[in-house]
Amino acid sequence: MTTTTHILGYPRIGEKRELKFAQEKYWRGEIEQTELKQVGATLREKNWATQAEAGLSFATAGDFAWYDHVLTTTLLLGHTPKRHANGFPDLDTLFKVGRGQSQAGCGCSGAAASDMTKWFNTNYHYIVPEFSKDDSFEVSWPQLFEEVNDAIKLGHNVKPVLLGPLSYLYLGKEIEEDFDRLTLLPRLLTAYQAILSKLANQGVEWVQIDEPILSLELEEKWGDAFKLAYQVIRSDVKVLLTTYFDSVSDTLDKIVELPVDGLHIDLSASPEQLDEVVEKLPQGWVLSAGVVNGRNVWRSDLSAQRERLQPVKDKLGDNLWVASSCSLLHSPVDLDLEPALSDEVKSWFAFAKQKVTEVALLGRALDGDHNAILVCDTYSQPIKDRKTAAHVNKPHVQARLNSISASLTERSAPYAERAAHQAEVLGLPLLPTTTIGSFPQTSEIRVQRSAFRSGQLSTDDYHQALKGHIADAVRRQEALDLDVLVHGEAERNDMVEYFAENLAGFQTTKFGWVQSYGSRCVKPAIVVADIEREKPITVEWSTYAQSLTNKQMKGMLTGPVTILCWTFPREDITRKAIADQLALALRDEVSDLQQAGINIIQIDEPAIREGLPLKKRDHKAYLQWAVDAFKIAAASAKPETQIHTHMCYSEFNEIIDSVAALDADVITIETSRSNMELLKAFEDFNYPNEIGPGVYDIHSPNIPSEEWIEELIKKAAEKIPAQRLWVNPDCGLKTRNWSETEAALANLVSAAKKLRAELV
């Protein structure tokens, strides 16, 4: 019996972000489209070769995207938004939908980009499909068929991947009122029929149809729609219905009634679902077991996975397939590009290329290959050794974790009492003005950081340069007459990576890039051991900045949940335990900052909402420990120390209780683009603490007028008492230039002063 092995997708960016650099050259008009397309073709061929050389049964095609796979599906279906449609869609059309008005060289006229949002609970973003009642669908964009043909010509056994019709509809949005996008399903299915027919004509035997929404708690109408959809698109091609990111426990009874040929489940995210799925699997169906985690960087315990799957193999025989849990696009590409890692640390990891090998090796072991079984056992040994390593599981950190009690999460005084202390100590006016933390990261800063990291600039010289940038930021803020200043974060390349580099327990990489959206890639740090703060991190910079001014200087920290969500977590302990370790480290930083004379400390938590589990029934438990982690970090603050937090979401209603439970003295939020509508959640809740609704959209180069800012502040004052309002931009100003920043902040300060005079 031979076990079929495959992956759900492979990273499309290239080992060293080749696609990113080619895209951006094309957008700048520096290369022709033919050169860009050649880069893509080379990457695809290399990806398929990686899968074939490892011994996988299939090479997956259709996982490559020039910008985003959902956007690729939009063009495949001939569903280009009308404002971007210009005859037959081409690559420039695709970029225009994803990016909006593009730079010269792409032939793209001005039009707004489609919305972008998170792909389920990952850090990848997709371009949101737009639906209106008159929409039609027709197979238009040939990329899928061309890539299948290319792979076949290269001799690969091809398994195309396609985003399913229900998930495609569900992940989009209606752009007309009184219209339900689900009513478009019959029209959409006609296009899917045509796609599957074309694939059959190309000689494809199996197609992977991704329906990740089957892992959600679906409304009945969406769950019921699956049976109709899959009856209509049934064809000569065998369908592997693919789910990931959570269990199918809520939808399994509907799934097993569908006219498909197999089911893929994510046994990394939800290992507990295996027994129920095996029990209910229809006769003759394939079960694709997603046991190699596609969302992390950790080596798989192949020995344990073999033992777990062997009874399933004995029962299902060749109908058990072995796979990655989800697409490997969420993993870095190749661990072999990290020679600076120690042999021990390297033995803990597997990036996408290594995960392909894991899948193939596990398949051979399940087939009874004695050598493969021995290799699995040897391969798994570093994972077992790591579990007992004292430098990974540190007794003193564990002891501190075990000492956490409810009292550790509470400030020493309630908000009303703290507010009185803070008013006396801080001496701030009505409608105090501040910024969110970062100031423009100029080319000079980036060049100096690069020189320091490459050893061309000494530590002393680099620190002197940073102090110069901090002094410049303080001077500019004083000239603007802002009430609460920040040091500008010149020393930070990234709000999470900076803390990861300065806390024990993290590992950073050189080429550990993963795609976030389009050409944007991120390089998450990896939690490899118990986390602790061995020395102060931000105190030197904040106290230096405070020494330059008589105004209040705000200390700037990234919160524990955000650091957790934007890094690769450990798999051997819970996310809660990691968050608590981070919280204790940040608690010490808060304590040191206030002892050094910093009276206002901001703990940013932009990712609390992003960390929500996919199933709503799991939200309460997550929010409880997420809130507790923030409170542990903040609770070392004395009553007179003012704790701020910052969040940038488009929706607060479902988490407003938890936002209030953070008990931050001041929360700043992103509201300018919503025209203050987001404040309604805080108004309805009767939010008790102070709030700074953003009045300057930092994502736009436009300079808001003083009158516009005044109107926004007035609207905010209709919902929140002016005595509890702050005036600030939406977010940090890292991506803006100084001329834009100073012009906008001058108007912000003037508007606040004018209204302050009217209200006093």
Swiss-Prot record:
Its cofactor is Zn(2+). The active site is at H699. Its EC number is 2.1.1.14. 5-methyltetrahydropteroyltri-L-glutamate binds at R17, E18, L19, K20, K118, R520, C521, W566, E610. Catalyzes the transfer of a methyl group from 5-methyltetrahydrofolate to homocysteine resulting in methionine formation. L-homocysteine binds at I436, G437, S438, E489, D604. It is an enzyme of class 2 (transferase). Binds 1 zinc ion per subunit. Zn(2+) binds at H646, C648, E670, C731. L-methionine binds at I436, G437, S438, E489, D604. GO terms for biological process: methionine biosynthetic process; methylation. The gene is metE. GO terms for molecular function: 5-methyltetrahydropteroyltriglutamate-homocysteine S-methyltransferase activity; zinc ion binding. Keywords: Amino-acid biosynthesis, Metal-binding, Methionine biosynthesis, Methyltransferase, Repeat, Transferase, Zinc. This is 5-methyltetrahydropteroyltriglutamate--homocysteine methyltransferase. It holds the Pfam family Meth_synt_1. Pathway: Amino-acid biosynthesis; L-methionine biosynthesis via de novo pathway; L-methionine from L-homocysteine (MetE route): step 1/1. It catalyses: 5-methyltetrahydropteroyltri-L-glutamate + L-homocysteine = tetrahydropteroyltri-L-glutamate + L-methionine. Belongs to the vitamin-B12 independent methionine synthase family.
